[in-house]
Amino acid sequence: YKEWQVTELTIIMYHYIRPIVGSEFPGLKGLEMEGFKRQLDFLETNYSIVSSEQVIDKITKNKALPPKACWLTFDDGYKDHYQYALPELVNRGLSGAFFPPRVPIQENVVLDVNLIHHILSCSNDINKLVTDLNHLCLQLGVTSEQIQEYYKEYAVANRFDNADTIFFKRMLQHVLPDQIRNEIASILFEKVVGIPEAEFSNRLYMNVDEVRKLVSS
């Protein structure tokens, strides 16, 4: 197919959409429902929200998209999307693309990234989290010298998080070997959040029936 300019399509990626203030996880970095509605108001006024079929036709057949085309995507299969986002889209006559992951929905587990998000949301002491992380690393065979090198390389603040938070995230996202980081994430989740992972998975992600209803909507 012919190449086309990325600027022809704006892609908006949504993750957590839910009532957050006053909820069980008030520290979670997500989008309040009222904020989602305001964003849709803005996008409907200033963009042409397109369907997945239009995007596919553009890619495969080079069919033109409308001016200021905008594609709404919803990642990770959260129950938020079924409970809050979908009814609002249907009410407005809008469509979006949903990308639920198979493993957490079918195997009743929690993705590491979601373990990390909720550990951080339930703690107001990042220094203690980093200390606990380092102690667990030592117990699982990571040397103190390695930890120091990792901290020097990855503890770099950005506009969203301080240095310790970035270090904590990076260590459990990709720096540590898979088996070690998976084990540490599970231990810290049980300690800090205190909800069995299987139960939490049922609460966080859509189930198979909800995915089927989503597809038929």
Model-predicted regions and their roles:
Residues 28-64, 203-216:
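C-terminal domain-boundary segment and adjacent tail
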Residues 73, 77-85:
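Membrane-embedded segments
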Residues 84-102:
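A short alpha/beta connector and helix-capping loop motif
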